[in-house]
Amino acid sequence: MTKTILLIDDEPDVTYTIKTILEDNGFKVDSFNDPILAFNYYKVNFYDLVILDIKMPKMDGFELYTKIREKDPKVKICFLTAIAMFNEEFRKIRLVLGKTINEDYFIQKPVEMEDLLKKLTSIINI
C-alpha cells in the first residue's frame, strides 16, 4: 500500500526537491509552502507521516505541530531544521511540548536524499 506524506516547508525549492524524490520512491506526497493552507487542507486519518519545517512565516512548525496533534493525535510527525539550529530547536521543542521527543523525528537540512528515505521509512514503520 502506498504511504501518504504531508510535506510543509516555506521554501519552494525544498518542497519540490523532497516531494520529487519521495514520489520517485513510491510515496504519495501533498506539499505546501504555507502552513496555514496546509492546516486548512489537513485530512484526519489520511496521512502516514507529516514533515514540518520549523522556521516558517505565519505559523511556525511548533504551533502547526500542536494544531495537527489536536486534530489527529495519532499521526506521525517529524521536523525539518537547519544543522546550525538543530540543538537549540531540539531543546526548544522538548520544552514547548512538555515531553521527550526522540531525536529520530528530526531531519537536519540540508539532507542527503538517501538518508531522508531511510529515516522516513523507519519513522513510518515504527
For the regions a protein language model found, what residue spans apply to each?
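Short amphipathic alpha-helix used as the core "switch/output" element in two-component signaling
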Residues: 40, 62-73, 95
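Active-site residues of response regulator receiver
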Residues: 9, 53, 81
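Two-component/phosphorelay signaling modules centered on CheY-like receiver
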Residues: 12-30
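Acidic catalytic/metal-coordinating carboxylates
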Residues: 33-34, 60-64
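Alpha4 helix (beta4-alpha4-beta5 surface) of REC/receiver domains from two-component response regulators
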Residues: 63, 84-107, 114, 118
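Acidic, metal-coordinating helix/loop segments flanking the phosphotransfer/catalytic sites
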Residues: 31-49
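Receiver (REC) domain active-site loop signature in two-component systems and cognate sites
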Residues: 56
